[in-house]
Amino acid sequence: MVEKVLSRSVRLIFAGGMVVGAAVQPALADDVQKVEITGSSLKRVDAETALPVQVVTKAEIAKTGVTSTQDLLATISAVSAGGSTTNAAGAGNSTGGLSSISLRGIGDSRTLVLVNGRRLAPFASGGGTVVNVNSIPLAAIERVEVLKDGASGIYGSDAMAGVVNFILTKNYEGVELSGGLGTPTASGGGQNGHASIVAGFNSDSGLSGVVSASYEQDKVLFGRDRSYAKSANNPPYYGSGATGQGNIQGPWTPGGGDDQATGGSGWGNPLAASGQCNTIGMTLYPGLSSKKQKYCAYDSGPDVGLLPDRKLINLTGSLTYKLNANAELFAEGLYSQSKVTTTYQASPARSDFFDPDVLFDGTATQKGTDRALLIYPNNPAYQSIAVPYLQSIGKSSFIGQPLAITARVQDFGPRQNVDTADQYRFIVGTRGTIANQDYEVAYATNQSKLNSAVTTGYFSQFAYAKAINDPNSNWNPWAPGGVQNPALAAQIQAAKFSGDYLSATSKSDTFDAKISGDAFKLGDSTSQYAVGLQSTRQNYALNPSSAYLNGDIAGLGGTVVPLDRSRNINSIFAELNVPIAKTLDGNLSVRSDRYNDVGNTTNYKANLRWQPVKEVLLRTSYGTGFRAPTLNDLWYPQSKGTSGQFDDNGPHGTGQTGIQIGNEITGGNPNLKPEKSKQFSMGAVLQPSSNFSVGADFFRIRISDYISTPTEQEIVDGYRRGDPAYQGLVTVDASNNIMSIIATTQNAGTADVQGVDLFVNFRQSLKDYGKLEINLNGTQMLKFDQTSPGGQLFNKVGTLVNNINGTNTAVIGANNGGVILRWKHMLSGTWTYGNWATTLVQNYASGYQTKDRMDGQPNFVGASQIYDLNLAYKGIKNAVFSVGVKNLFDKQPDTFIPVSNQFQSGYDIYQYDPRGRFVYVNATYKFK
């Protein structure tokens, strides 16, 4: 069989999907063999598919200069920041080391991640919802196949947006050593180092195997190391509203409760009134409190990590034993351990943050202290500082009463979390051929385990409050530098907390079997079929320490309750490929999944591939999909805790920003339904000549019963604009301050996503001057419309806000990842001359609108063009050396204003690498 020109072309297109210039040669006729392509259960000659699959090879990965699997995926145009999690996101708000992928921006839980065609256990952090892509070793990746189309008809749940399949090295003989170092050219942290070994063998006895081991390390980078991130205050763009030291919440009756106590800014701060916030390490907030007073806020910018300290160890192995020409046994193993240390600002403390802490339950007499930090009239600081201030703002009626005060507790230093995540997968099975039918049977066991600990910056709220609230403590919240008297300082230190506070485990055990082969003849052509079954048991367990269970550890966000739930999933699937005519193929797949907790679902996919002439390929597909709610979505017990930050500066709001409250109800919902989707795509591939090809694919994804946990900002915005769906989720006090929020998981509206993927590939021999390759891969988002639970429509392409009733309101989902870019592409050119190869890459991202500035004016981030350069040399036998620069011209970020929930300041953590210009050297040597 001789491949047609277009078949070779499409192989080049797929294999060069990124593309960064690796020369991918078409196979000769004798090399053609049937393989399984992501998106199908059938084995066929590669590239004979109606589905848009992009393939990134090992050689191409080397030319990008990426240092992690997360960074590699970010170069793919179909991958969106929307709905994903990154290392940078975890640096300022611990995610346990999770890095995830979101195709089309519809969320990482709607993109299926596979390794060698099978699932990994979801990451134990964040509810066991998504796969941590950094547990997949970059050094062991042979290629990445990205199916840019829904595939629930083949794979079941989660494949709404598409599938990312990591194929690890399997057939290798010899030993390969590689390593590299990289550093930003700017001072500070952010350095990277990595080393790996891959070894493989093939024996005459039929036994073959490959093992790999790798180590990666990233150094921490802080906000103080970058000019654009060193402060959370940058008027008129943004200002820090984080809880400051010494703000007066209001009078407090000991043993009773608050009289006129408010949130974190309420009646202002004596030092703010005199312009002396800096004496206690705070800053003057550029606005007024809900009580129209000046107050001090905490500038978290310098202390927040932009990138965490990360250490990653990966081990992989595969073993195959040929029983005979038609059967073999196989085994695969994967182990990964990541240790991520995140460091950020000191913990805040105030009365509403103590609300979830069960140690304060009961009266103060019963428990020994009040649910607030109090300063008493007999305190010298009360008389010398508080009294004159209260008189000056017309609140002499407060004098003589204890006052509730806010604190930014510097006594224990900055907060530091250490998250250790272990992931393993082990597979055993057999495959072969019986009567010309291919079969495969396998058992896989998967586990992701997370252990979270704290080292500094954390303390028992109850013990701290008890020390402060001693009427004889003489606590001075306005003391210069925060220095307290020695006796009180010693008592405070006894409240320190360190050690493990949470462990979580996500497990799955799966048995699967399938058979495929030729079905029946249609003229001169043969149809193909595949049928199979799968049985999976999933388990998710969450085990907090007693202190975390009580909600008593300051800075961890309130109570976390135990969870241990399991479920069974049984599935059957089938696929049929029919050659309808000489140039027209049709494919139909169907899968039925039975869950013992959310019911049954059946999904299908149909596609057509038409090649009227050898230079033209037309393709289209239509299918349905679903996503089952996770065990955490369904069963996580509802509990009260501290909210994330949000703003209340819209119509009918208080005007405050950076608010946190201590009375937020979160948790699962056992009444959730599975999400449903419908997907459609159609595209064309053209190759007018052997060295030029171009293609485009239109896609549309419609999702109903969208599962989400609305953010505080979404809820507050909906409540303030009068959306009926949010009115029961918020309570306010007599002064209109938000006092409580209910943010449980729900089926919340719909989404309609449309766009076009485009690629162009060109290769040209320069004769005596080598050869030139130019490749473009881009994605144009045409539409991303999502409705809120109340039916409010949000248009999300190119913006984080929509104008609703004259006010720019955060789009739904804006807090859960980054913006949906209108256009994103990677354009690369490689010139190869002798033993040298030079690659220049342009990474382009269109501009977008952010949250409004503090003065109410709109803010925009401009289009970004970041260039990377790589120079490789292979003139030494079995060795390759490369040097490179990422962000060649050291482009600095435009000023970014987040909707909320981003501790880092000044830049978009999902779009910009704060390392800036980054230089690296890599080397690889093969022993054969």
Predicted feature descriptions by range:
Residues 459, 782-783, 843-851, 872-928:
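C-terminal beta-signal and adjacent terminal beta-strands/loops
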Residues 171-174, 204-206, 324-327, 433-438, ...:
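Short loop/turn motifs that connect adjacent beta-strands in outer-membrane beta-barrel proteins
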Residues 69-72, 99-102, 132-134, 158-179, ...:
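N-terminal periplasmic accessory domains that precede
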Residues 128, 227-234, 274-310, 316, ...:
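Surface-exposed, low-complexity loop segments enriched in small/polar and acidic residues
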Residues 118-148:
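Short acidic/polar hinge/loop motifs at secondary-structure boundaries
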Residues 34-67, 123:
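N-terminal periplasmic "start-of-domain" segments of outer-membrane beta-barrel proteins
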Residues 74-119:
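Extracytoplasmic beta-strand/coil segments of soluble accessory domains associated
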Residues 641, 772-874, 889-890:
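C-terminal beta-barrel architecture of Gram-negative outer-membrane proteins
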